[in-house]
Amino acid sequence: MSSSPAILPVTNQQAATQSQPPINSHAFRTFLSRLSSSLRESLSQRRPWLELVDRSSFARPDSLTDSFSRIRKNLAYFKVNYSAIVSLVLAFSLLSHPFSLLVLLSLLGSWMFLYLFRSSDQPLVLFGRSFSDRETLLGLVLTTIVVVFMTSVGSLLTSALTIGIAIVCLHGAFRVPDDLFLDEQEPANAGLLSFIGNSAATSAAASVVAGRV
């Protein structure tokens, strides 16, 4: 009497794939945590707004060199306040153009959920076709170029940033720095500027990108 053949275990690849989360939740939570802590640190280092608009501290600069010197010193002292002003101008411009805001949010969401925070072992499947990480990156880069340079989004962002920077430079040129500006020594990387300059290298999102390329 012959024995029945042994039954080999079979893994359901489709079920295993479906059980995996669509995004790397740990990297996403780490990114949000770093963003939140950086914003809190930035807000804690902002200068009093009344000091920013103190009318007694405004005077016309004597020369162009004096203007640049004032701008440099005021940027070092009011950097968080200036960042907030530029952000407010940018936010107001986007809110006044809902379509551009929707397009920009859609583009940002595509980068976050289709590439940056998508699980590395979770392939991107669209229209019945599986895309590699390099193909996904190339598609997102091309889409970003089209959206920024061939729609109203790019011109809107450029005009908003230009207005914000012009306001900052105008204030910095006419705001007379006092001794507090010259005596105060601050770290080169702090608050919001630190997050902008360094978080990309230290956040979990950067680790995910490095692992994909």
Curated annotation (Swiss-Prot):
It is a multi-pass membrane protein. Pfam families: PRA1. The chain crosses the membrane at residues 75-94, 98-117, 137-157, 161-181, 190-210. Keywords: Endosome, Membrane, Transmembrane, Transmembrane helix, Transport. The keyword Transmembrane applies. Residues 1-21 are annotated as: Disordered. One of its GO terms (biological process) is vesicle-mediated transport. It is found in: Endosome membrane. GO terms for cellular component: endoplasmic reticulum; endosome; endosome membrane; Golgi apparatus; Golgi trans cisterna; trans-Golgi network. Its main location: membrane. The keyword Nucleotidyltransferase does not apply. Belongs to the PRA1 family. Interacts with PRA1B1, PRA1B3, PRA1B4, PRA1B5, PRA1B6 and PRA1E. May be involved in both secretory and endocytic intracellular trafficking in the endosomal/prevacuolar compartments. This is PRA1 family protein B2. It comes from Arabidopsis thaliana. The gene is PRA1B2.
